[in-house]
Protein backbone atom coordinates (compact mmCIF):
# COMPACT_ATOMS: atom_id res chain seq x y z
CA UNK A 1 0.00 0.00 0.00
CA UNK A 2 1.28 3.47 -0.91
CA UNK A 3 1.95 5.57 2.19
CA UNK A 4 0.41 9.07 2.21
CA UNK A 5 -0.68 11.68 4.77
CA UNK A 6 -4.47 11.58 4.83
CA UNK A 7 -5.16 15.13 6.00
CA UNK A 8 -3.70 16.72 2.84
CA UNK A 9 -6.93 15.66 1.09
CA UNK A 10 -9.07 18.76 1.75
CA UNK A 11 -12.60 19.83 0.78
CA UNK A 12 -11.65 21.71 -2.41
CA UNK A 13 -8.14 20.53 -3.21
CA UNK A 14 -5.09 18.63 -1.99
CA UNK A 15 -2.72 20.76 0.08
CA UNK A 16 0.17 20.20 2.47
CA UNK A 17 3.61 21.24 3.67
CA UNK A 18 6.21 20.39 1.04
CA UNK A 19 8.64 17.66 2.09
CA UNK A 20 6.61 16.87 5.23
CA UNK A 21 2.98 16.07 4.45
CA UNK A 22 3.26 16.66 0.69
CA UNK A 23 6.24 14.63 -0.55
CA UNK A 24 7.54 13.74 -4.02
CA UNK A 25 6.18 10.21 -3.52
CA UNK A 26 2.78 11.63 -2.56
CA UNK A 27 2.76 13.71 -5.77
CA UNK A 28 3.58 10.60 -7.82
CA UNK A 29 0.82 8.49 -6.23
CA UNK A 30 -1.70 11.35 -6.52
CA UNK A 31 -0.84 11.47 -10.24
CA UNK A 32 -1.54 7.72 -10.47
CA UNK A 33 -4.85 8.15 -8.60
CA UNK A 34 -5.98 11.02 -10.85
CA UNK A 35 -5.11 8.84 -13.85
CA UNK A 36 -7.28 6.02 -12.45
CA UNK A 37 -10.25 8.43 -12.10
CA UNK A 38 -9.56 9.76 -15.61
CA UNK A 39 -9.56 6.22 -17.03
CA UNK A 40 -13.01 5.60 -15.48
CA UNK A 41 -14.29 8.60 -17.43
CA UNK A 42 -12.51 7.70 -20.67
CA UNK A 43 -10.12 10.67 -20.38
CA UNK A 44 -6.74 10.20 -22.07
CA UNK A 45 -5.16 13.70 -21.89
CA UNK A 46 -4.73 16.14 -19.01
CA UNK A 47 -3.32 19.69 -18.91
CA UNK A 48 -0.72 20.31 -16.19
CA UNK A 49 0.50 23.67 -14.87
CA UNK A 50 2.15 25.18 -11.80
CA UNK A 51 2.27 28.53 -10.02
CA UNK A 52 5.41 30.40 -8.97
CA UNK A 53 6.16 28.52 -5.77
CA UNK A 54 9.70 27.26 -5.31
CA UNK A 55 8.57 23.63 -4.91
CA UNK A 56 6.51 23.71 -8.14
CA UNK A 57 9.01 22.27 -10.66
CA UNK A 58 9.85 19.24 -8.50
CA UNK A 59 6.22 18.41 -7.67
CA UNK A 60 5.36 18.85 -11.35
CA UNK A 61 7.99 16.30 -12.37
CA UNK A 62 6.59 13.67 -9.96
CA UNK A 63 2.86 14.14 -10.58
CA UNK A 64 3.56 14.16 -14.34
CA UNK A 65 5.40 10.84 -14.02
CA UNK A 66 2.43 9.44 -12.06
CA UNK A 67 0.09 10.44 -14.89
CA UNK A 68 2.27 9.20 -17.76
CA UNK A 69 3.17 5.91 -16.00
CA UNK A 70 -0.59 5.28 -15.97
CA UNK A 71 -0.91 5.92 -19.71
CA UNK A 72 -2.27 9.48 -19.52
CA UNK A 73 -0.83 11.99 -21.99
CA UNK A 74 0.10 15.37 -20.48
CA UNK A 75 -0.12 18.85 -21.98
CA UNK A 76 2.48 20.65 -19.84
CA UNK A 77 1.78 24.41 -19.91
CA UNK A 78 4.54 25.32 -17.44
CA UNK A 79 4.25 28.26 -15.04
CA UNK A 80 0.76 29.77 -15.32
CA UNK A 81 -2.07 31.15 -13.19
CA UNK A 82 -4.71 28.64 -12.09
CA UNK A 83 -7.28 30.17 -14.50
CA UNK A 84 -4.78 29.85 -17.38
CA UNK A 85 -4.52 26.14 -16.55
CA UNK A 86 -8.34 25.95 -16.63
CA UNK A 87 -8.24 27.80 -19.98
CA UNK A 88 -5.83 25.18 -21.36
CA UNK A 89 -7.89 22.33 -19.88
CA UNK A 90 -11.16 23.60 -21.40
CA UNK A 91 -9.74 24.50 -24.81
CA UNK A 92 -7.19 21.71 -25.32
CA UNK A 93 -8.02 18.76 -23.03
CA UNK A 94 -11.80 18.43 -22.83
CA UNK A 95 -11.96 20.14 -19.44
CA UNK A 96 -9.31 18.02 -17.68
CA UNK A 97 -6.39 19.61 -15.86
CA UNK A 98 -4.25 19.64 -12.72
CA UNK A 99 -2.83 22.84 -11.25
CA UNK A 100 0.07 22.72 -8.81
CA UNK A 101 -0.60 25.65 -6.48
CA UNK A 102 -0.53 26.65 -2.84
CA UNK A 103 -2.85 29.57 -3.61
CA UNK A 104 -2.49 32.04 -0.70
CA UNK A 105 -0.97 29.61 1.81
CA UNK A 106 2.50 30.25 3.34
CA UNK A 107 5.58 29.63 1.11
CA UNK A 108 6.27 26.12 2.45
CA UNK A 109 2.85 24.87 1.29
CA UNK A 110 1.83 23.57 -2.10
CA UNK A 111 -0.98 21.47 -3.49
CA UNK A 112 -3.18 20.43 -6.41
CA UNK A 113 -6.45 21.75 -7.83
CA UNK A 114 -8.03 19.28 -10.23
CA UNK A 115 -10.75 19.09 -12.86
CA UNK A 116 -11.79 16.09 -14.95
CA UNK A 117 -14.16 16.29 -17.90
CA UNK A 118 -15.23 19.80 -16.94
CA UNK A 119 -15.99 18.94 -13.29
CA UNK A 120 -13.92 20.35 -10.44
CA UNK A 121 -12.85 17.60 -8.05
CA UNK A 122 -14.05 18.39 -4.53
CA UNK A 123 -15.44 16.76 -1.41
CA UNK A 124 -16.18 13.10 -2.04
CA UNK A 125 -14.24 13.01 -5.34
CA UNK A 126 -11.06 14.05 -3.49
CA UNK A 127 -11.65 11.39 -0.82
CA UNK A 128 -11.98 8.85 -3.66
CA UNK A 129 -8.44 9.77 -4.79
CA UNK A 130 -7.20 9.02 -1.26
CA UNK A 131 -9.02 5.66 -1.32
CA UNK A 132 -7.38 4.78 -4.66
CA UNK A 133 -3.91 5.54 -3.22
CA UNK A 134 -4.56 3.56 -0.02
CA UNK A 135 -5.95 0.54 -1.89
CA UNK A 136 -3.36 0.67 -4.70
CA UNK A 137 -6.26 1.00 -7.12
CA UNK A 138 -4.01 2.27 -9.91
CA UNK A 139 -4.44 1.43 -13.58
CA UNK A 140 -1.83 -0.57 -15.48
CA UNK A 141 -0.87 1.20 -18.69
CA UNK A 142 -0.37 -0.56 -22.03
CA UNK A 143 2.00 2.24 -22.96
CA UNK A 144 3.56 5.31 -21.40
CA UNK A 145 1.61 8.57 -21.82
CA UNK A 146 3.28 11.26 -23.92
CA UNK A 147 4.24 14.78 -22.75
CA UNK A 148 3.73 17.86 -24.93
CA UNK A 149 4.95 21.25 -23.74
CA UNK A 150 3.01 24.33 -24.83
CA UNK A 151 2.99 28.04 -23.96
CA UNK A 152 -0.69 29.03 -23.77
CA UNK A 153 -0.14 32.56 -22.43
CA UNK A 154 -0.47 34.13 -25.90
CA UNK A 155 -3.79 32.40 -26.68
CA UNK A 156 -5.16 33.36 -23.25
CA UNK A 157 -4.04 37.00 -23.62
CA UNK A 158 -5.40 37.30 -27.17
CA UNK A 159 -8.75 35.77 -26.21
CA UNK A 160 -9.34 38.38 -23.48
CA UNK A 161 -7.99 41.35 -25.45
CA UNK A 162 -10.13 40.22 -28.40
CA UNK A 163 -13.45 40.50 -26.62
CA UNK A 164 -13.10 42.88 -23.65
CA UNK A 165 -13.40 46.43 -25.00
CA UNK A 166 -12.83 49.56 -22.91
CA UNK A 167 -14.48 52.87 -23.78
CA UNK A 168 -11.35 54.73 -22.63
CA UNK A 169 -7.93 53.82 -21.23
CA UNK A 170 -7.79 53.77 -17.41
CA UNK A 171 -4.70 54.48 -15.34
CA UNK A 172 -4.44 51.51 -12.96
CA UNK A 173 -2.13 50.12 -10.27
CA UNK A 174 -1.82 46.35 -9.83
CA UNK A 175 -0.35 44.32 -6.95
CA UNK A 176 0.40 40.65 -7.62
CA UNK A 177 2.02 40.04 -4.23
CA UNK A 178 4.89 38.24 -6.04
CA UNK A 179 2.40 35.56 -7.08
CA UNK A 180 2.32 34.06 -10.57
CA UNK A 181 -0.29 36.60 -11.78
CA UNK A 182 2.51 39.17 -11.91
CA UNK A 183 4.02 37.44 -14.95
CA UNK A 184 0.90 38.10 -17.03
CA UNK A 185 -1.28 40.87 -15.53
CA UNK A 186 0.72 43.93 -16.63
CA UNK A 187 0.90 42.80 -20.25
CA UNK A 188 -2.81 41.94 -20.29
CA UNK A 189 -4.01 45.28 -18.94
CA UNK A 190 -1.62 47.20 -21.19
CA UNK A 191 -2.96 45.11 -24.08
CA UNK A 192 -6.43 46.44 -23.21
CA UNK A 193 -5.04 49.97 -23.62
CA UNK A 194 -4.48 50.95 -19.98
CA UNK A 195 -1.56 52.67 -18.28
CA UNK A 196 -0.29 50.28 -15.60
CA UNK A 197 1.76 50.78 -12.44
CA UNK A 198 3.07 47.37 -11.35
CA UNK A 199 3.69 46.46 -7.71
CA UNK A 200 5.42 43.18 -6.76
CA UNK A 201 4.89 41.59 -10.16
CA UNK A 202 8.21 39.70 -10.06
CA UNK A 203 7.29 36.07 -9.37
CA UNK A 204 8.98 35.05 -6.11
CA UNK A 205 7.73 32.05 -4.13
CA UNK A 206 9.19 33.51 -0.91
CA UNK A 207 6.56 36.32 -1.07
CA UNK A 208 9.05 38.86 0.31
CA UNK A 209 6.77 41.95 0.34
CA UNK A 210 3.43 40.81 1.70
CA UNK A 211 1.29 37.71 1.62
CA UNK A 212 -0.57 37.24 -1.70
CA UNK A 213 -4.08 37.28 -0.18
CA UNK A 214 -6.18 40.30 -1.21
CA UNK A 215 -9.05 39.32 1.12
CA UNK A 216 -6.98 40.65 4.05
CA UNK A 217 -6.80 44.48 4.32
CA UNK A 218 -3.18 44.40 5.56
CA UNK A 219 -2.10 42.96 2.20
CA UNK A 220 -3.64 45.91 0.31
CA UNK A 221 -1.79 48.69 2.11
CA UNK A 222 0.99 49.03 -0.51
CA UNK A 223 -1.64 49.31 -3.25
CA UNK A 224 -3.60 51.90 -1.24
CA UNK A 225 -0.37 53.93 -0.80
CA UNK A 226 0.41 53.71 -4.55
CA UNK A 227 -3.06 55.04 -5.38
CA UNK A 228 -2.74 57.85 -2.87
CA UNK A 229 0.72 58.92 -4.04
CA UNK A 230 0.43 58.29 -7.80
CA UNK A 231 -1.84 58.99 -10.77
CA UNK A 232 -3.65 55.62 -10.88
CA UNK A 233 -7.45 55.81 -10.75
CA UNK A 234 -8.09 52.30 -9.45
CA UNK A 235 -6.15 49.40 -7.90
CA UNK A 236 -6.40 45.66 -8.59
CA UNK A 237 -4.78 42.93 -6.45
CA UNK A 238 -4.46 39.17 -6.94
CA UNK A 239 -3.79 36.14 -4.79
CA UNK A 240 -0.91 33.69 -5.25
CA UNK A 241 -2.42 31.83 -8.21
CA UNK A 242 -4.51 34.77 -9.53
CA UNK A 243 -7.95 33.19 -9.33
CA UNK A 244 -9.13 35.89 -6.88
CA UNK A 245 -9.47 39.65 -7.26
CA UNK A 246 -9.12 42.50 -4.76
CA UNK A 247 -10.24 46.04 -5.66
CA UNK A 248 -9.26 49.38 -4.11
CA UNK A 249 -10.56 52.86 -5.02
CA UNK A 250 -8.49 56.02 -5.46
CA UNK A 251 -9.43 57.16 -1.95
CA UNK A 252 -8.29 53.88 -0.36
CA UNK A 253 -11.65 52.16 0.05
CA UNK A 254 -11.59 48.39 -0.33
CA UNK A 255 -14.47 47.18 -2.51
CA UNK A 256 -15.17 43.71 -1.18
CA UNK A 257 -16.20 40.98 -3.63
CA UNK A 258 -19.90 40.99 -2.72
CA UNK A 259 -20.07 44.67 -3.74
CA UNK A 260 -17.98 43.98 -6.88
CA UNK A 261 -20.61 41.37 -7.76
CA UNK A 262 -23.31 44.07 -7.70
CA UNK A 263 -21.56 45.79 -10.59
CA UNK A 264 -20.86 42.56 -12.48
CA UNK A 265 -24.48 41.41 -12.02
CA UNK A 266 -25.87 44.74 -13.22
CA UNK A 267 -23.65 44.60 -16.31
CA UNK A 268 -24.61 41.00 -17.19
CA UNK A 269 -28.32 41.66 -16.51
CA UNK A 270 -28.29 44.67 -18.86
CA UNK A 271 -27.64 42.21 -21.70
CA UNK A 272 -29.44 39.17 -20.21
CA UNK A 273 -32.65 40.21 -18.38
CA UNK A 274 -33.88 37.56 -15.95
CA UNK A 275 -30.49 35.82 -15.67
CA UNK A 276 -29.59 33.93 -12.50
CA UNK A 277 -26.82 35.31 -10.25
CA UNK A 278 -25.21 33.14 -7.55
CA UNK A 279 -23.50 34.42 -4.39
CA UNK A 280 -22.21 32.69 -1.27
CA UNK A 281 -23.67 32.65 2.22
CA UNK A 282 -21.08 35.17 3.49
CA UNK A 283 -22.27 37.94 1.12
CA UNK A 284 -23.98 41.21 2.08
CA UNK A 285 -27.76 41.20 2.57
CA UNK A 286 -27.89 44.16 0.15
CA UNK A 287 -26.86 41.95 -2.79
CA UNK A 288 -30.05 39.90 -3.36
CA UNK A 289 -32.35 42.98 -3.46
CA UNK A 290 -29.89 44.68 -5.86
CA UNK A 291 -29.95 41.66 -8.21
CA UNK A 292 -33.78 41.55 -8.14
CA UNK A 293 -34.00 45.33 -8.67
CA UNK A 294 -31.89 44.94 -11.83
CA UNK A 295 -34.10 42.16 -13.18
CA UNK A 296 -32.16 39.08 -12.07
CA UNK A 297 -32.82 35.99 -9.99
CA UNK A 298 -30.69 35.89 -6.82
CA UNK A 299 -29.47 32.48 -5.57
CA UNK A 300 -27.58 31.99 -2.28
CA UNK A 301 -25.18 29.03 -2.23
CA UNK A 302 -22.65 27.35 0.08
CA UNK A 303 -19.21 28.96 0.32
CA UNK A 304 -16.51 27.20 -1.76
CA UNK A 305 -15.49 27.56 -5.40
CA UNK A 306 -16.40 23.96 -6.26
CA UNK A 307 -19.92 24.38 -4.80
CA UNK A 308 -20.41 27.62 -6.75
CA UNK A 309 -19.21 26.03 -10.01
CA UNK A 310 -21.55 23.04 -9.66
CA UNK A 311 -24.47 25.36 -8.77
CA UNK A 312 -23.74 27.39 -11.91
CA UNK A 313 -23.88 24.24 -14.02
CA UNK A 314 -27.12 23.13 -12.36
CA UNK A 315 -28.93 26.50 -12.60
CA UNK A 316 -27.43 27.96 -15.78
CA UNK A 317 -26.39 31.12 -13.86
CA UNK A 318 -24.39 33.58 -15.97
CA UNK A 319 -22.31 35.14 -13.19
CA UNK A 320 -21.41 34.22 -9.61
CA UNK A 321 -19.13 35.39 -6.86
CA UNK A 322 -18.05 34.62 -3.35
CA UNK A 323 -16.77 36.75 -0.51
CA UNK A 324 -13.22 35.37 -0.72
CA UNK A 325 -12.74 37.04 -4.14
CA UNK A 326 -13.59 34.28 -6.63
CA UNK A 327 -15.74 35.68 -9.47
CA UNK A 328 -17.17 33.32 -12.11
CA UNK A 329 -18.43 34.49 -15.50
CA UNK A 330 -20.35 32.17 -17.79
CA UNK A 331 -21.45 35.06 -20.00
CA UNK A 332 -18.68 35.69 -22.59
CA UNK A 333 -16.33 33.36 -20.66
CA UNK A 334 -15.95 29.72 -19.59
CA UNK A 335 -17.58 29.71 -16.16
CA UNK A 336 -14.38 29.34 -14.11
CA UNK A 337 -13.02 31.86 -11.61
CA UNK A 338 -10.28 34.16 -12.88
CA UNK A 339 -8.93 37.22 -11.06
CA UNK A 340 -7.21 38.71 -14.13
CA UNK A 341 -10.30 38.26 -16.30
CA UNK A 342 -12.62 39.66 -13.59
CA UNK A 343 -10.28 42.66 -13.41
CA UNK A 344 -10.60 43.14 -17.18
CA UNK A 345 -14.41 42.98 -16.99
CA UNK A 346 -14.38 45.50 -14.14
CA UNK A 347 -12.25 47.92 -16.17
CA UNK A 348 -14.61 47.48 -19.14
CA UNK A 349 -17.55 48.58 -16.94
CA UNK A 350 -15.64 51.42 -15.25
CA UNK A 351 -14.29 52.78 -18.56
CA UNK A 352 -17.77 54.21 -19.24
CA UNK A 353 -17.21 56.64 -16.34
CA UNK A 354 -14.79 59.54 -15.89
CA UNK A 355 -14.61 58.69 -12.18
CA UNK A 356 -14.30 54.91 -11.58
CA UNK A 357 -13.84 55.31 -7.81
CA UNK A 358 -17.12 57.21 -7.54
CA UNK A 359 -18.98 54.38 -9.35
CA UNK A 360 -17.57 51.86 -6.86
CA UNK A 361 -18.02 54.04 -3.75
CA UNK A 362 -21.68 54.63 -4.66
CA UNK A 363 -22.56 50.91 -4.50
CA UNK A 364 -24.88 50.14 -1.53
CA UNK A 365 -23.04 49.45 1.71
CA UNK A 366 -23.86 48.39 5.29
CA UNK A 367 -21.75 48.35 8.42
CA UNK A 368 -20.03 44.97 8.53
CA UNK A 369 -17.25 43.07 10.27
CA UNK A 370 -14.41 41.30 8.50
CA UNK A 371 -14.38 37.53 8.96
CA UNK A 372 -13.88 36.58 12.60
CA UNK A 373 -12.36 33.19 13.39
CA UNK A 374 -12.79 30.90 16.40
CA UNK A 375 -10.24 28.08 16.74
CA UNK A 376 -11.71 24.64 17.33
CA UNK A 377 -10.33 22.17 19.87
CA UNK A 378 -8.03 19.52 18.37
CA UNK A 379 -9.96 16.73 16.65
CA UNK A 380 -13.38 18.39 16.73
CA UNK A 381 -15.65 18.47 13.68
CA UNK A 382 -16.67 22.05 12.84
CA UNK A 383 -19.91 21.05 11.14
CA UNK A 384 -20.91 18.99 14.18
CA UNK A 385 -20.05 21.88 16.53
CA UNK A 386 -22.32 24.19 14.49
CA UNK A 387 -25.15 21.60 14.57
CA UNK A 388 -24.87 21.28 18.36
CA UNK A 389 -24.89 25.07 18.81
CA UNK A 390 -27.83 25.49 16.42
CA UNK A 391 -29.90 22.83 18.23
CA UNK A 392 -30.03 24.87 21.45
CA UNK A 393 -29.79 28.38 19.97
CA UNK A 394 -32.55 30.95 20.31
CA UNK A 395 -32.48 34.06 18.13
CA UNK A 396 -35.26 36.34 19.32
CA UNK A 397 -36.51 38.71 16.62
CA UNK A 398 -35.02 36.71 13.71
CA UNK A 399 -36.93 36.95 10.42
CA UNK A 400 -35.23 33.96 8.76
CA UNK A 401 -32.71 31.24 9.66
CA UNK A 402 -30.74 29.90 6.67
CA UNK A 403 -28.93 26.57 7.14
CA UNK A 404 -27.45 25.81 3.70
CA UNK A 405 -23.93 26.39 5.10
CA UNK A 406 -23.75 26.77 8.87
CA UNK A 407 -26.22 29.18 10.40
CA UNK A 408 -27.10 32.54 8.84
CA UNK A 409 -29.66 34.41 10.95
CA UNK A 410 -31.49 37.33 9.31
CA UNK A 411 -32.94 40.18 11.38
CA UNK A 412 -34.93 43.20 10.12
CA UNK A 413 -31.79 45.35 10.43
CA UNK A 414 -28.89 42.95 9.78
CA UNK A 415 -27.58 39.37 9.87
CA UNK A 416 -25.14 37.15 11.71
CA UNK A 417 -23.37 34.10 10.28
CA UNK A 418 -21.44 31.23 11.82
CA UNK A 419 -20.17 28.38 9.69
CA UNK A 420 -17.42 25.77 9.78
CA UNK A 421 -14.47 26.39 7.48
CA UNK A 422 -13.93 23.57 4.98
CA UNK A 423 -10.19 24.16 4.85
CA UNK A 424 -9.01 24.84 8.43
CA UNK A 425 -10.21 23.81 11.95
CA UNK A 426 -12.06 27.06 12.68
CA UNK A 427 -15.54 28.53 12.89
CA UNK A 428 -16.02 31.59 10.69
CA UNK A 429 -18.27 34.43 11.88
CA UNK A 430 -19.49 37.51 10.02
CA UNK A 431 -21.92 40.28 10.97
CA UNK A 432 -23.62 43.07 9.05
CA UNK A 433 -26.25 45.64 10.04
CA UNK A 434 -27.71 49.06 9.30
CA UNK A 435 -26.25 50.64 12.47
CA UNK A 436 -23.42 50.01 14.93
CA UNK A 437 -25.98 49.42 17.70
CA UNK A 438 -27.69 46.74 15.59
CA UNK A 439 -24.42 44.97 14.78
CA UNK A 440 -23.52 44.87 18.49
CA UNK A 441 -26.98 43.52 19.40
CA UNK A 442 -26.69 40.73 16.79
CA UNK A 443 -23.14 39.90 17.92
CA UNK A 444 -24.33 39.59 21.52
CA UNK A 445 -27.01 37.09 20.45
CA UNK A 446 -24.32 35.00 18.75
CA UNK A 447 -21.90 35.43 21.66
CA UNK A 448 -24.42 33.84 24.03
CA UNK A 449 -24.80 30.87 21.65
CA UNK A 450 -21.02 30.43 21.15
CA UNK A 451 -20.30 30.63 24.89
CA UNK A 452 -22.78 27.82 25.57
CA UNK A 453 -19.85 25.62 24.45
CA UNK A 454 -17.10 26.04 27.11
CA UNK A 455 -14.36 25.10 24.59
CA UNK A 456 -15.06 28.04 22.26
CA UNK A 457 -13.59 31.50 22.86
CA UNK A 458 -15.48 34.54 21.57
CA UNK A 459 -13.11 36.42 19.21
CA UNK A 460 -14.02 40.04 20.06
From Swiss-Prot:
Gene3D superfamilies linked: Alpha-D-Glucose-1,6-Bisphosphate, subunit A, domain 3, Alpha-D-phosphohexomutase, C-terminal domain
PROSITE patterns attached to this UniProt entry: PGM_PMM
Subcellular location as annotated: Cytoplasm
Main subcellular localisation: cytoplasm
Residues bound to Mg(2+): 103, 239, 241, 243
Keyword terms: Carbohydrate metabolism, Cytoplasm, Glucose metabolism, Isomerase, Magnesium, Metal-binding, Phosphoprotein
InterPro entries: A-D-PHexomutase_a/b/a-I, A-D-PHexomutase_a/b/a-I/II/III, A-D-PHexomutase_a/b/a-II, A-D-PHexomutase_a/b/a-III, A-D-PHexomutase_C, A-D-PHexomutase_C_sf, A-D-PHexomutase_CS, Alpha-D-phosphohexomutase_SF
Binding site for substrate: 103-104, 113, 243-244, 303, 322-324
EC number(s) recorded for this UniProt protein: 5.4.2.2
Function: This enzyme participates in both the breakdown and synthesis of glucose.
Family statement: Belongs to the phosphohexose mutase family.
Listed name of the protein: Phosphoglucomutase
Organism: Neisseria gonorrhoeae
Top-level taxonomy: Bacteria, Pseudomonadati, Pseudomonadota, Betaproteobacteria, Neisseriales
Gene: pgm
Amino acid sequence: MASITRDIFKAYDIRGIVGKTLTDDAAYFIGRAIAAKAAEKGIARIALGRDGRLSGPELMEHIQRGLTDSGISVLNVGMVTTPMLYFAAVNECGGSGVMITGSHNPPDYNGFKMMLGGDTLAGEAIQELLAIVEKDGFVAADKQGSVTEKDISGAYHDHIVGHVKLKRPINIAIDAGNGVGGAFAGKLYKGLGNEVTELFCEVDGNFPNHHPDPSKPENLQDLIAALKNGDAEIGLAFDGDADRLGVVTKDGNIIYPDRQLMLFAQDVLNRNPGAKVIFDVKSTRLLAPWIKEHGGEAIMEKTGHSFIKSAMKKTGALVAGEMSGHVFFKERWFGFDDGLYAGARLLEILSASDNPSEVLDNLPQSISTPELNISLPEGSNGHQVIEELAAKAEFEGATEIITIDGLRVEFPDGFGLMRASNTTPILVLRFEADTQAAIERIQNRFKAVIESNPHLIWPL
